[in-house]
Amino acid sequence: MAKKIKQIAIYGKGGIGKSTTTSNISAALSIAGYKVMQFGCDPKSDSTNTLRGGEYIPTVLDTLRDSHSVKAQDVIFEGFNGIYCVEAGGPAPGVGCAGRGIITSVSLLKQQRVFEELDLDFVIYDVLGDVVCGGFAVPVREGIAEHVYTVTSADFMAIYAANNLFKGIQKYSREGGALLGGVIANSINAPYAKEIVDDFVKRTDTQVVEYVPRSVTVTQSELQGKTTIEAAPQSEQAKVYQRLAQRIAEHTESKVPAPLDTHELRQWAADWGKQLVALESGLIAPAAAGNL
């Protein structure tokens, strides 16, 4: 009987730390003995940089444009600790759909049965989450990914993007699409950031998988073109990523989230804005945050 490959999609708005988080998860899983492929699904094509010493790799779409026929070995590159790295790429500037690279790349690798031939344990898709449409929705819509995670902070636009993803998961769940594994709360250092994220996941019937603090260790590692797992394996930040990777590896039950509608989300955000003003001015006690 063929081994079941665990396919995971990690979404998040641009700049939220999605690729940093994904690469450290991949690195931690590989250190734990799993065979991993990281599949970059962002037109910037930089998902796998820190797995390859800061180097960019040729993308699937660029390779197709140059040769019109592509073999898997032309677009799969080995990174840190044997992690297989793929970048879908995007169209030429001003031309076509940015999500098209995902559709083309996934089809190419599936046709050539690459996942089975490499005997992978995990395929992790790193997907731009500002919009959940067209090609960017493929891992969710087609059920390619079994479990979906979203990286968010307490910033409104990050939460807005997460809520939009929840809407997409809810819609496609009726057609066999992927379900939500949980929320990865990133950069949780600011006052009340944890409380804001906790309140959001409670209201959307989801869960936080891990709280990832902002850390200078991550910055130092990325300046070297490395993940924290590679550059600072004994650091406290590395332990956070290792714990997150273990939870993802052990996770089996995903669910359909309950997204807020646009009015509910705006009202929720406005209520939190008022609470933060009251907290800062001492009108309410910190323990009351999120309970008003």
Task: List the model feature ranges, each with a label.
Residues 3-43:
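Walker A/P-loop phosphate-binding motif and the immediately C-terminal alpha-helix
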Residues 7, 38, 83-85, 208-211:
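Conserved beta-strand scaffold positions in the cores of enzyme catalytic domains, especially
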Residues 14, 86, 105, 126, ...:
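Residue-level signature of catalytic and energy-coupling elements of molecular machines
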Residues 28-88:
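N-terminal phosphate/diphosphate-binding loop that engages ATP/GTP or pyrophosphate donors
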Residues 43-45, 90, 129, 189:
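Short, glycine/acidic-enriched loop or turn micro-motifs at the edges of active sites
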Residues 90-100, 156-157:
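Flexible beta-alpha connector loops of hexameric P-loop NTPases
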Residues 111, 115-122, 127-214, 219-220:
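Conserved catalytic-core segment of NTP-binding enzymes
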Residues 171-292:
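C-terminal lobe/tail of nucleotide-utilizing enzymes
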